[in-house]
Amino acid sequence: MAEKFTQHTGLVVPLDAANVDTDAIIPKQFLQKVTRTGFGAHLFNDWRFLDEKGQQPNPEFVLNFPEYQGASILLARENFGCGSSREHAPWALTDYGFKVVIAPSFADIFYGNSFNNQLLPVTLSDAQVDELFALVKANPGIHFEVDLEAQVVKAGDKTYSFKIDDFRRHCMLNGLDSIGLTLQHEDAIAEYEDKQPEFMR
């Protein structure tokens, strides 16, 4: 059972870049592991660090700014998560501590993978995202509230509505990944299997 997502209030970091691909999110040299943990240390590795080993932080990269340490909401530009279909991208984001990504658009595969890993991708219009970037840059350290039940983002004195597919919303609210969804039908599966001929079991 995955962690339930109903509402999250967190520090927002503005990544003012469009077309952020999965290789930028988690470079290919860090993909050897098949478990979901440990990838956060390499999130945006080529941008966060000046050296290949990830030991010299780049002071000009926004995730390294002191005011954004502990951020759990990532504000980004259009086509976030494009490139290859690696599921390691949402793994790296969640392992780092992100719960929500807000952008005007997402690559389709990344969008689906995010829900599978309890990372909420929130789609707002370009104009709304522009407003949020201006708000965050004028108020470093600002927190947003993201309410999945009400499907709204509360930022400053404004509220922004967003849409999520009902099925994906249900899964996030109830902490259901693909295994959890299957286990919801465990009795029906067992009943079906009992009806199968012996040679098919």
Curated annotation (Swiss-Prot):
It comes from the Bacteria. Keywords: Amino-acid biosynthesis, Branched-chain amino acid biosynthesis, Leucine biosynthesis, Lyase. Pathway: Amino-acid biosynthesis; L-leucine biosynthesis; L-leucine from 3-methyl-2-oxobutanoate: step 2/4. Its EC number is 4.2.1.33. The keyword Lyase applies. GO terms for molecular function: 3-isopropylmalate dehydratase activity. GO terms for cellular component: 3-isopropylmalate dehydratase complex. GO terms for biological process: L-leucine biosynthetic process. It catalyses: (2R,3S)-3-isopropylmalate = (2S)-2-isopropylmalate. Catalyzes the isomerization between 2-isopropylmalate and 3-isopropylmalate, via the formation of 2-isopropylmaleate. Belongs to the LeuD family. LeuD type 1 subfamily. PANTHER family: 3-ISOPROPYLMALATE DEHYDRATASE SMALL SUBUNIT, 3-ISOPROPYLMALATE DEHYDRATASE SMALL SUBUNIT 2-RELATED-RELATED. This is 3-isopropylmalate dehydratase small subunit 1. It comes from Salmonella choleraesuis (strain SC-B67).
